[in-house]
């Protein structure tokens, strides 16, 4: 049986939260339904808005100059927010998006962006798509390999393996990341139970993946740790909401920030959700 861990509540009263990023001692998050990016003080949960994104923000990441990249979901844009708050279009993702643009990870200036692949809220038929690669100068391409709802992205501690949540594929996939940022050798890293829909994820220093189990409430809702090959070792059950995203942070990089949203697919389609930030200590440190 997996080891169970408890959680504490840090903040509530949000819409649909996504893409937590711990950066410079603060927690940055997207709020889909309130169309804003916020920054939170992880000590007490207080927060403020730092950007309006009318077409709904999703994935977040940072460049070496301190500017922030923001995925704008509905119009398939990758935005760049400078330190002074000025926002410009970094890349147009539209030619490569099926459905909304989604979560993202930035590694050495390269952005890897997921997309739904189809109109989820509209009830369209499920379709495969491709992970999107955006170079530091804004060039966009589709990564080889058909994937099913590419979502959370993370770099393995080995520095050369990029991991991907395939939400409706019920698995964690992997690519080899080349020195120029391109991805090759798409493969399955861990098969998950059919009731697990991995969303946002993070990696600990031992190489285990912590992922959120989305689109489900009840006994299996929450967060899980899986090792390469599919062995689940730990879990944090959150039966009152979807598990959506997770990241390590804190002064010692040993606090898990858990993003949960109380909603259902019909409510999600109508823009209704109650978002929470929760925390857990699991005896491990983040890799990144």
What are these language model-derived features?
Residues 48-52, 88-92, 141-145, 183-191, ...:
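Beta-propeller fold detector
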Residues 1-15, 45, 186-187, 280-283:
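A short helix->beta-strand "capping" segment at the edge of beta-propeller domains
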Residues 1-5, 25, 34, 40, ...:
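Blade/loop signatures of beta-propeller domains
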Residues 247-288:
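Blade-level signature of beta-propeller repeat domains, shared across WD40, Kelch, NHL, RCC1
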Residues 11-25, 53-72, 94-113, 118, ...:
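Beta-rich, blade/repeat-based domains predominating
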Residues 36-38, 77-79, 129-132, 171-173, ...:
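A short loop-to-beta-strand structural motif that recurs across blades of beta-propeller domains
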Residues 41-45, 81-86, 134-138, 176-181, ...:
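Short loop/turn segments that connect beta-strands within beta-propeller blades
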Residues 32-33, 73-74, 118-129, 167-170, ...:
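Short, solvent-exposed loop/turn segments at conserved positions within beta-propeller repeat blades
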């Amino acid at each position: 049986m997996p080891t169970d861990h408890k959680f504490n509540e840090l903040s509530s009263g949000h819409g649909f939260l996504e893409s937590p990023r711990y950066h410079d001692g603060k927690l940055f998050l997207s709020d889909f339904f309130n169309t804003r990016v916020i920054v939170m003080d992880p000590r007490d949960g207080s927060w403020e808005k730092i950007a309006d994104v009318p077409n709904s923000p999703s994935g977040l990441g940072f460049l070496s100059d301190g500017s922030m990249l923001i995925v704008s979901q509905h119009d398939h844009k990758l935005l760049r927010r400078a330190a002074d708050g000025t926002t410009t279009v970094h890349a147009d993702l539209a030619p490569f998006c099926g459905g909304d643009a989604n979560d993202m990870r930035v590694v050495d200036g390269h952005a890897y962006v997921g997309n739904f692949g189809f109109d989820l809220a509209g009830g369209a038929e499920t379709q495969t798509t491709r992970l999107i690669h955006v170079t530091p100068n804004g060039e966009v391409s589709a990564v080889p390999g058909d994937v099913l709802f590419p979502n959370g992205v993370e770099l393995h501690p080995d520095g050369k393996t990029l991991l991907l949540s395939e939400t409706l594929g019920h698995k964690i996939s992997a690519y080899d990341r080349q020195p120029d940022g391109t991805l090759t050798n798409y493969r399955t890293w861990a098969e998950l139970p059919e009731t697990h829909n991995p969303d946002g994820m993070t990696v600990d220093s031992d190489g285990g993946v912590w992922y959120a189990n989305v689109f489900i409430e009840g006994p299996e809702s929450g967060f899980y740790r899986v090792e390469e090959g599919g062995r689940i070792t730990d879990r944090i059950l959150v039966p009152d909401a979807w598990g959506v995203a997770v990241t390590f942070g804190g002064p010692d990089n040993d606090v898990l920030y858990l993003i949960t949203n109380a909603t259902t697919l019909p409510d999600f389609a109508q823009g209704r959700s109650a978002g929470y930030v929760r925390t857990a200590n699991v005896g491990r440190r983040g890799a990144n």
